[in-house]
From Swiss-Prot:
Its EC number is 3.5.1.108. Pathway: Glycolipid biosynthesis; lipid IV(A) biosynthesis; lipid IV(A) from (3R)-3-hydroxytetradecanoyl-[acyl-carrier-protein] and UDP-N-acetyl-alpha-D-glucosamine: step 2/6. Pfam families: LpxC (PF03331). Signal peptide: none annotated. Keywords: Hydrolase, Lipid A biosynthesis, Lipid biosynthesis, Lipid metabolism, Metal-binding, Zinc. This is UDP-3-O-acyl-N-acetylglucosamine deacetylase.
Length: 305
């Protein structure tokens, strides 16, 4: 039986909120089978628990934001992406601010934290959402689509007309049957443009953004002294984001994701469209390992890590 997973022990870290610029303490705790991933604002007079769910995503302008009863937890996508990559089904996530810390702008720090805590199997079948028919959402020239596929693969095309991005490639495809999330996706950093950062700061946002946690571009080049971690790091980060955005559906997806210029908002619309059509998906488990997609077999790699 392909089983659910959580972490073995509590682990915590401190980082900076990308938009608030404030210090955030993040604590990850083991959770029982069938809990899902539950975020808790422990800094509020009465702690508010917000389970990760497609319907709980509110604001998506600059990040994926979970909302409930007036409480928010922002920028959840990188941590959710790491959980997906390592096959974590159940986890308590405690934060003392309204943002998950940005760390280095990728999912690598969260992968390290989760691996440091240890990952253990639980005595319950891992549930998957299998895409049964194609679902597509569009917004202008932007597109996001899920298609039936026995595994998990993603194809993403970006369209940033910028010399530094043009040089690295605007399209990337990955099939986790034969590719490692930790090696090929987790280290890809978020990126932004210097003129946009200035405008965001005037709005009280991006106060924690720096060359330490993002790739920053001016009109012509990259401002960071550090080299790119991947030749096509920009589009790989978009895939990292998409994996995290899709994982708020509550279970790993068995299907293929195709996107053109998609973002957090369109990704969430795609999940809602999928869930709204009961003929488009089914929840499945695998009693026999040999019946499961290779991408999710633990003897190959944890989840698709």
């Amino acid at each position: 039986m392909l089983k659910q997973r959580t972490i073995k022990s509590l682990v915590k870290t401190v980082g900076i909120g990308l938009h608030s610029g404030r210090k955030v303490t993040l604590t990850l705790r083991p959770a029982p089978a069938d809990t899902g991933i539950v975020f808790t604002r422990v800094d509020l007079p009465e702690a508010v628990e917000i389970p990760a769910a497609a319907g709980a995503i509110g604001d998506t302008r600059l990040a994926s934001v979970l909302q409930k009863d007036g409480a928010r937890v922002s920028t959840v996508e990188h941590l959710m992406s790491a959980c997906a990559g390592l096959g974590i089904d159940n986890l308590y996530v405690d934060v003392d601010a309204e943002e998950i810390p940005i760390m280095d702008g990728s999912a690598a720090s969260f992968v390290f934290l989760l691996q440091s805590a240890g990952i253990e199997q639980q005595n319950a079948a891992k549930r998957f959402i299998r895409v049964k028919k194609a679902v597509e959402v569009r917004e202008g020239d932007k597109l996001a689509r899920l298609e039936p596929f026995f595994g998990f693969k993603l194809s993403f095309t970006i369209d940033f007309r910028h010399p530094a991005v043009d040089k690295t490639g605007q399209n990337f495809e990955i099939d986790f049957a034969d590719t490692s999330y930790v090696r090929e996706i987790a280290r890809a950093r978020t990126f932004g443009f210097a003129h946009e950062v200035e405008a965001l700061r005037e709005m009280g946002l991006a106060r924690g953004g720096s060359l330490d946690n993002a790739i920053v571009l001016d009109e012509h080049r990259m401002l960071n002294n550090e080299e790119l971690r991947y030749g096509d790091e920009f589009v790989r980060h978009k895939i990292l984001d998409a994996i995290g955005d899709l994982y708020v559906v509550g279970h790993p997806l068995i299907g293929a994701y195709v996107a053109h210029k998609s973002g957090h908002g369109l990704n969430n619309q795609l999940l809602r469209a999928l869930l709204a059509d009961q003929e488009a998906y089914e929840v499945v488990t695998f009693d026999r390992m040999e019946d499961a997609p290779v991408a999710f077999l633990p003897q190959v790699q944890p989840a698709f890590a």
